């Protein structure tokens, strides 16, 4: 059976996350149902990142095995047609046959996330659901400097969910940048893999530095505590986007 790679974007606002949920809509389910309507096959997708409820993606990657070597453009267009008909806020950007040993999750060598903070007195209107609105002025420069403390290989127990199923809390954070453009603050994070809720936990703690609630030393102490209770506020899912996945 030929294996297809799917490049996907979606608005996570209306979904309970990527992964199948018993009684709530998921991105995975929406795409699998669209594929079944296209080719009559009940399939199971595997994705590079199992995003949480409310988290968006502009560059999610998944793979699926189909019975026929359909042209990639046909798969893309047909699945999109069924997604549109279902009213799902999901789009297949590209579909292509890949080697049988390609695995969207385990073949990935890097994942890239963007977190957007709307930092102004007025709430979000056009971007509601796509940003974290923080009305108090944040010092993005202080956030960026503090972020450097989290770079490299660390035990990120403080910054992972208590429900995280990863065998080890140790991860190597390759990038964590904070920048401001007008009222928008962007936090960009890159690593081979992330722990559950790690990016949102780091952003929430950096926000505490930005509003003067924490010093750099207090952020460092939180990291070194290796204690979930030491984490700052967990940023809401609205502002988080999976924006890239690397493969060899």
From Swiss-Prot:
The cross-references to Pfam families, in alphabetical order and at most eight, read: PseudoU_synth_1
Q: Gene3D superfamilies, per this entry?
A: Pseudouridine synthase I, catalytic domain, C-terminal subdomain, Pseudouridine synthase I, catalytic domain, N-terminal subdomain
CDD domains in the cross-refs? PseudoU_synth_EcTruA
The answer to whether the entry has keyword tRNA processing is yes
Q: Which InterPro entries match?
A: PsdUridine_synth_cat_dom_sf, PsdUridine_synth_TruA, PsdUridine_synth_TruA_a/b_dom, PsdUridine_synth_TruA_C, TruA/RsuA/RluB/E/F_N
- Look up keyword Transferase and say if it applies: no
- Residues binding substrate, per UniProt: 113
One GO BP on record is: tRNA pseudouridine synthesis
Coiled-coil ranges (or none): none
Name the residues annotated as catalytic in the UniProt entry: 52 (nucleophile)
Query: Might you give the EC number(s) for this enzyme?
Result: 5.4.99.12
GO molecular function annotation: RNA binding; tRNA pseudouridine(38-40) synthase activity
Q: Give the enzyme class.
A: isomerase
Keywords attached to this entry: Isomerase, tRNA processing
What protein family is recorded?
Belongs to the tRNA pseudouridine synthase TruA family.
Assembly mode = Homodimer.
For this entry, the protein name equals: tRNA pseudouridine synthase A
Instruction: Tell me the organism.
Output: Mesorhizobium japonicum (strain LMG 29417 / CECT 9101 / MAFF 303099) (Mesorhizobium loti (strain MAFF 303099))
């Amino acid at each position: 059976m030929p294996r297809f790679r799917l490049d996907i974007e979606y608005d996570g606002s209306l979904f309970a996350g990527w992964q199948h949920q018993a009684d709530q809509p998921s991105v995975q389910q929406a795409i699998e149902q669209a594929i079944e309507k296209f080719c009559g096959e009940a399939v199971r997708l595997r994705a590079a990142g199992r995003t949480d409820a409310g988290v968006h993606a502009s560059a999610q990657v998944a793979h699926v095995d189909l019975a026929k070597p359909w042209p990639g453009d046909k798969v893309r267009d047909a699945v999109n047609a069924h997604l549109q008909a279902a009213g799902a806020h999901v789009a297949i950007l590209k579909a292509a046959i890949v080697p049988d040993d390609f695995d969207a999750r385990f073949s990935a060598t890097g994942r890239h996330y963007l977190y957007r903070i709307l930092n102004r007195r007025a709430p979000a209107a056009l971007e509601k659901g796509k940003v974290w609105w923080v009305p108090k002025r944040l010092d993005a420069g202080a956030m960026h400097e503090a972020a450097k403390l989290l770079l490299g290989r660390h035990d990120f127990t403080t910054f992972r969910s208590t429900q995280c199923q990863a065998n080890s809390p140790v991860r190597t954070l390759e990038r964590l940048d904070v920048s401001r453009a007008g009222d928008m603050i962007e936090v960009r994070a890159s690593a081979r893999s992330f722990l559950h809720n790690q990016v949102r936990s780091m952003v929430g703690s950096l926000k505490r530095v930005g509003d003067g609630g924490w010093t750099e030393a207090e952020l460092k102490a939180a990291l070194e505590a290796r204690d979930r209770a030491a984490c700052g506020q967990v940023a809401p899912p609205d502002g988080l986007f999976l924006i890239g996945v690397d493969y060899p």
